[in-house]
């Protein structure tokens, strides 16, 4: 639900989530946004706060992202 001019005040909320993937940072972001969208209504965007990799046996095993997900509260 985009913010519409002249439609009154919208209240947004931001939650922080962590998501991970064994494939890539992009996959971790997609999984995190998909999961958040299943629980939260009106997700508007996500900001990647931080990202890191977990290394096992000298190789990247996990791509981890820390996201701030914004959603609009509905009355």
Predicted regions: what is each one?
Residues 52-75:
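A cross-kingdom feature marking charged/low-complexity
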Residues 10-44:
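Short, well-ordered alpha-helical segments
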Residues 1-7, 56-58:
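Short beta-strand/turn micro-motifs at beta-sheet edges
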């Amino acid at each position: 639900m985009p913010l519409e001019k002249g439609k009154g005040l919208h209240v947004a909320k931001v939650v922080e989530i962590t998501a991970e993937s064994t494939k890539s940072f992009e996959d971790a972001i997609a999984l995190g946004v998909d999961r958040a969208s299943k629980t939260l209504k009106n997700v508007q965007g996500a900001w990647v706060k931080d990202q890191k990799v977990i290394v096992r046996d000298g190789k990247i095993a996990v791509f981890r992202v820390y996201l701030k997900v914004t959603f609009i509260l509905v009355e």
